[in-house]
């Protein structure tokens, strides 16, 4: 039709949010660190079910502690994920480049490569990529304010076995995890 303007490709509307999750449990695990009350919390969470695979509270957020939890998760659940997704924190990702401009490889990345696990990272300043972790830490911190004496292990048990999730069709992470093995 003549006289009408053409749409400008550069001015497209905001992209619609799309929820993603792998169709089976143990394909991708998310991991991250968060500080709360001068302690560092590290968690590995299954992408499909949102089940906490391993958790720990430490004095410092280190690669060694993250690897300890990864091995703990694999041994306790007798499974090795295909992919690990994390942010670009120094515990996981080599943020330095050598003199030739090549990105270094972190101890965490080397260990995953040795185990045959792919390592994916979120974009910088884009917490939505690892949103399941961000949401989990938010839930933990809110609950800890109400349940002061609850240990991390008690919280994880409640989260995995009792707390239903809207995104999981009102099932618990444990139920969804068992369905999708």
Where are these predicted regions, by residue range?
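Basic, flexible linker segments flanking DNA-binding modules
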Residues: 1-30, 103, 172-180
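Active-site beta-loop-alpha junctions of metal-dependent nucleic acid enzymes
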Residues: 37, 55-83
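Short, solvent-exposed loop/turn segments at secondary-structure boundaries
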Residues: 56-58, 95-100
């Amino acid at each position: 039709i003549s006289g009408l303007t053409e749409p400008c490709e550069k001015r497209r509307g905001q992209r619609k949010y799309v929820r993603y999750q792998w169709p089976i449990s143990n394909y991708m695990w998310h991991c991250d660190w968060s500080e709360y009350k001068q302690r560092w919390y590290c968690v590995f969470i299954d992408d499909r079910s949102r089940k906490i695979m391993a958790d720990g509270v430490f004095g410092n957020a280190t690669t060694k502690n993250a690897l300890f939890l990864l091995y703990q998760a694999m041994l306790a659940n007798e499974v090795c994920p295909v992919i690990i997704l994390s942010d670009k924190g120094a515990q996981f990702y080599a943020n330095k480049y050598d003199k030739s401009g090549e990105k270094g490889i972190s101890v965490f990345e080397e260990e995953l490569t040795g185990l045959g696990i792919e390592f994916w990272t979120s974009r910088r300043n884009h917490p939505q990529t690892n949103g399941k972790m961000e949401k989990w830490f938010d839930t933990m911190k809110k609950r800890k304010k109400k349940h002061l004496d609850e240990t991390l292990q008690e919280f994880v048990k409640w989260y995995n076995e009792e707390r239903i999730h809207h995104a999981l069709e009102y099932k618990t992470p444990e139920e969804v995890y068992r369905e999708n093995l």
